[in-house]
Structures are given as C-alpha cells and as structure tokens.
C-alpha cells in the first residue's frame, strides 16, 4: 500500500512539473515575404537599374535561400540570373550584405575561407531584407558595371516596399 502511495506521489510530481528544455516551444513561427511582396521588390529593383541605364537580373529569396522571384531584363547577360541568386543566398546565409562580405573575406583575413562555401558569392549586390529586426528574405542584383551599383538598386527596391514590411 505504501509503495502504491509513493508511486502515485512521484507520478503526480512529474505530471505537475513537466520536463522541459529551457522552456523552449516545440514549434517556432517566423515571417516570410508573400510572393506579391517579393514580386514588387524585384520589379522596383529592376526598374531602378533600368532608370540608371543598366540591364540586370534580380533574384529574391526567402529567409531559407529558396528563390521566390527572378527577373532578367532583355539584354542582361546570360550569367546574371544565377549570379543574382547566389548574391541573394549569400546575403541571407551570412546575414549581411555582400559588399561587407567581400571586405571581410579578402585574401589574408581570418574569414577568407568563407569564399569557398558552395554557392557563396562575395560580390556587391546581395542584401538581406529585414522586417522588425528579423531577416525575411534577401535580394541579389547582377548586371550593372559594378557591385556597388547592383547594391544601390537592391536598396532602392527594399526601400520601395518598406511600408509593407512594417509589422
């Protein structure tokens, strides 16, 4: 009888105080851009580069690096869609723009080995897209005569959807 009481008491304690790992939930939630938002971002970026006289490709990826939208202007080089995708992927993967990554991974720096990560591309034009302090996607631009111009176009595109990203 005492054993049954003891067993019941121990069982009650375990049920009353569930085991947990640092109070972490079993599931997480996150925000991603809708397809429509990604399309607006890509088109606004392409339009800005066109206005500046450049034919480019633009790729928008979600927070996991999966392509949501890719646009290639009529005379953009055949390599530009893949280059834009890799820039966008690099920006979200390393959580920083690719101009900064280019600087931080130059030959001779402690981070130079990052340049050998498959699909990583350390060339200007990749920028993470953030909303309320969280990365919700990334954008990559390729085709302007320099990564700095690709980067400028990407940032103009992001600014064009800023009101959609506020929550």
Label every model-predicted segment.
Residues 5-18:
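Bacterial N-terminal signal peptides
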């Amino acid at each position: 009888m005492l054993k049954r009481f003891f067993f019941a008491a121990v069982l009650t304690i375990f049920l009353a105080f569930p085991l947990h790992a640092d109070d972490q939930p079993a599931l997480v939630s996150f925000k991603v851009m809708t397809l429509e938002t990604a399309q607006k971002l890509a088109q606004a970026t392409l339009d800005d580069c066109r206005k500046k006289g450049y034919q480019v490709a633009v790729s928008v990826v979600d927070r996991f690096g999966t392509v949501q939208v890719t646009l290639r202007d009529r005379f953009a080089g055949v390599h530009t869609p893949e280059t834009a995708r890799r820039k966008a992927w690099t920006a979200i993967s390393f959580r920083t723009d690719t101009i900064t990554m280019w600087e931080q991974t130059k030959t001779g720096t402690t981070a130079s080995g990052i340049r050998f990560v498959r699909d990583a591309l350390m060339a200007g034009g990749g920028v993470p897209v953030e909303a309320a302090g969280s990365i919700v996607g990334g954008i990559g631009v390729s085709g302007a005569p320099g990564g700095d111009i690709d980067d400028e176009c990407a940032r103009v595109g992001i600014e064009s959807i800023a009101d959609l990203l506020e929550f």
